[in-house]
A protein has these predicted regions:
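N-terminal cap/lid segment of alpha/beta-hydrolase-fold proteins
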Residues: 1-22
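Active-site glycine-rich loops that stabilize anionic/oxyanionic intermediates
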Residues: 26, 34-37
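The conserved beta1-alpha1 loop
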Residues: 30-34, 169-170
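Alpha/beta-hydrolase active-site loop
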Residues: 41, 70-87
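Conserved alpha/beta-hydrolase
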Residues: 46-66
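Gly/Ala-rich beta-loop-alpha elbow adjacent to hydrolase catalytic centers
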Residues: 95-104
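The alpha/beta-hydrolase serine catalytic core
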Residues: 109-229
Length: 229
């Protein structure tokens, strides 16, 4: 496994990343963190994804980590820049946590997994307070609360084609996320609950890793069958 840092260059901005390259490549994956996170938080998940043969790119979103831009409504462009870079290695999977899960599910990736995705258009005062106190200090943004303005401007997730989207969430997740994910279960969406997982640790748990890998293997298997038609 080759692991190295790379700056992905795009139109007027650069996306810091860490790339995992397996010896035998069967496609690619882009992995993105949530609000107040960083690419370094997602390295454990990235390694497990790369082990099944996906060249895996973990990035810093604007306003986070080594990214030089402040958080703003162009945040999806960071993920799309990484997807574009990965296209030369085959079909691209998008995997993200929280805000990153929302971005993965609305991105141009061929298949997406949202881990505790922030699908809601609004969150309660208590959730906003916790995010501000626990995660906000890690983010470079023009003003406090910019996250909520960015969230309002992101497009909603289209679940019409459920075969290309999957969701994993925790039984002890953010209340708004639990409620919305439970409602999606009735619409035949691919939704998996991880028992006892919290919003803050779900992307580090072995049960989550196993669920992600299982979903990816199913997707890759179906994709190969489709390619042979």
């Amino acid at each position: 496994m080759d692991i190295r840092r790379k700056i992905i260059k795009s139109n007027g901005f650069n996306v810091p990343s860490i790339i995992f390259t397996p010896s035998d490549i069967h496609g690619a994956a882009v992995i993105i963190h949530g609000y107040g996170g960083s690419k370094e938080e997602m390295l454990g998940l990235a390694y497990r994804v790369a082990e099944i043969g996906l060249k895996t790119c973990v990035i810093d979103l604007r306003g986070h980590g080594e990214h030089t831009l402040n958080l703003d409504e162009g945040i999806l462009q960071d993920m799309e820049a990484a997807i574009k870079y990965c296209r030369s290695f085959g079909k691209v999977v998008g995997i993200g946590h929280s805000l990153g899960g929302r971005l993965a599910l609305i991105s141009s990736s061929d298949f997406a997994i949202g881990i505790s995705p922030a699908l809601n258009t609004s969150f309660g005062e208590e959730t906003q307070r916790i995010l501000k106190n626990v995660r906000g200090y890690r983010v470079r943004e023009a003003f406090s609360g910019e996250l909520w303005e960015v969230m309002k401007k992101l497009e909603k997730v289209n679940f019409d084609d459920n075969t290309k989207k999957s969701i994993i969430y925790g039984s002890r997740d953010v209340p708004e996320i639990i409620s919305l994910c439970n409602s999606l279960k009735t619409k035949n969406s691919s939704v998996t609950e991880i028992e006892n997982a919290m919003h803050s640790d779900i992307f580090t748990l072995e049960r989550t890793f196993q669920s992600v890998i299982s979903k990816l293997k199913d997707y890759l298997s179906d994709s190969k069958k489709y390619d042979k038609l």
